[in-house]
Amino acid sequence: MIKRDPIKLFDLWYDEVLAFPFKGKDPTAMVLATCNKDLKPSARVVLLKKHSDQGFIFFTNINSRKGKEITDNPFAALVFDWSYIAKQVRIEGKVKILPCQDADEYYASRPVGSKIGAWCSKQSSVLEDRMSFLKSIEKMTAEFHGKSIPRPDYWVGVVVVPMLMEFWQEGLNRIHTRYQYTRSNNMDVWNVVELYP
């Protein structure tokens, strides 16, 4: 039976993958595909930090390559490869930057080393001297010992607001099951179809 709400279906599958005993892969890992202003694509793995009816959230340095690409072209695709439970979820949607408060809250929960890394890493830039980079981490670690570490302005939360969600489940003899959900400007109404495998 087809579920009418893809977010609820995602919740069911996500709970299943979180409960799966094999821990060799991070179930929050998702491939994020973006395009620059010339429509040249790039992809990388990021971690899902939160999801809801509003979308799928990750955090990043907005000055990184992916940050620049979502600024220039605010659309993205996500793929959750859960092959170890014979499932995959594909998402396409609009990209929005979250309010500073959301980024502040998540940043505050991060380990000290991750906070310092966010300050010291010029993500996606050429690293010409690794020793200098490591020394800058040591220096900042000493400077902020026992102190609160503020969030850099360029470290932001990003939400992918889904406009298309596809659920794929492996079947015998490659007779897989695929359900595709889409919505247009009426954000409350999802249309669902089954696709040939």
Curated annotation (Swiss-Prot):
EC number: 1.4.3.5
The protein's annotated pathway: Cofactor metabolism; pyridoxal 5'-phosphate salvage; pyridoxal 5'-phosphate from pyridoxamine 5'-phosphate: step 1/1; Cofactor metabolism; pyridoxal 5'-phosphate salvage; pyridoxal 5'-phosphate from pyridoxine 5'-phosphate: step 1/1
One Pfam family, short name: PNP_phzG_C
Keyword Flavoprotein: yes
Catalysed reactions listed for this entry: pyridoxamine 5'-phosphate + O2 + H2O = pyridoxal 5'-phosphate + H2O2 + NH4(+); pyridoxine 5'-phosphate + O2 = pyridoxal 5'-phosphate + H2O2
Keyword annotations of the record: Flavoprotein, FMN, Oxidoreductase, Pyridoxine biosynthesis
Record: residues binding FMN: 44-49, 59-60, 65-66, 88, 123-124, 168, 178
UniProt superkingdom: Bacteria
Cited InterPro entries: Pyridox_Oxase (IPR000659), Pyridox_Oxase_CS (IPR019740), Pyridox_Oxase_N (IPR011576), Pyridoxamine_oxidase_dimer_C (IPR019576), Split_barrel_FMN-bd (IPR012349)
One example GO MF annotation: FMN binding
Bound cofactor: record note: Binds 1 FMN per subunit.
Amino acids binding substrate: 49, 106, 110, 114, 174-176
GO biological process: pyridoxine biosynthetic process
Cofactor(s) annotated in UniProt: FMN
Enzyme class: oxidoreductase
Family: Belongs to the pyridoxamine 5'-phosphate oxidase family.
Summary of subunit composition and partner proteins: Homodimer.
Protein purpose: Catalyzes the oxidation of either pyridoxine 5'-phosphate (PNP) or pyridoxamine 5'-phosphate (PMP) into pyridoxal 5'-phosphate (PLP).
Name of the protein this chain belongs to: Pyridoxine/pyridoxamine 5'-phosphate oxidase
Annotated source species: Ehrlichia canis (strain Jake)
Lineage: Bacteria, Pseudomonadati, Pseudomonadota, Alphaproteobacteria, Rickettsiales
Gene this protein is translated from: pdxH
